[in-house]
């Protein structure tokens, strides 16, 4: 009888472990769906406020400075949700925004000394 109880205990533990794993996998899938939905929502908003050349410019910036592109996107989405953007933004507008955000950055100074 002792062996049967031990076997039953092991089976219960395995079942509980499998159930936990299934729940964790389900939670991961749900989180991924939420992230995808948020990405789709952001892209939809950006399509409404940026013309194709502006989107392309922002994507090019993302290749070099993903943090800067995210910052610009977040600001644009926030302004759009507040109703402060009432026209399509062009590539020139994006260039102006990028220059304003990066103008405060200090450029490294390289001095060359000759002997």
Swiss-Prot record:
Residues 15-25 have a biased composition (Low complexity). Keywords: DNA-binding. Gene3D superfamilies: PDCD5-like. SUPFAM superfamilies: Double-stranded DNA-binding domain. GO terms for molecular function: DNA binding. Pfam families: dsDNA_bind. GO terms for cellular component: cytosol. It comes from the Archaea. Residues 1-41 are annotated as: Disordered. The keyword Translocase does not apply. Residues 26-41 have a biased composition (Basic and acidic residues). Belongs to the PDCD5 family. HAMAP family: dsDNA_bind. This is DNA-binding protein Ta0052.
């Amino acid at each position: 009888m002792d062996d049967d109880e031990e076997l039953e205990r092991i089976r219960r533990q395995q079942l509980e472990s499998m159930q936990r794993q299934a729940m964790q996998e389900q939670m991961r899938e749900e989180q991924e769906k939420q992230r995808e939905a948020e990405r789709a929502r952001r892209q939809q908003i950006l399509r409404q406020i940026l013309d194709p050349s502006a989107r392309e410019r922002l994507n090019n910036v993302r290749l070099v400075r993903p943090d800067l592109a995210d910052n610009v996107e977040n600001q644009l989405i926030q302004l759009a949700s507040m109703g402060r953007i009432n026209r399509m933004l062009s590539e020139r507008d994006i260039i102006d925004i990028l220059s304003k955000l990066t103008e405060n950055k200090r450029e490294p100074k390289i001095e060359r000394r000759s002997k």
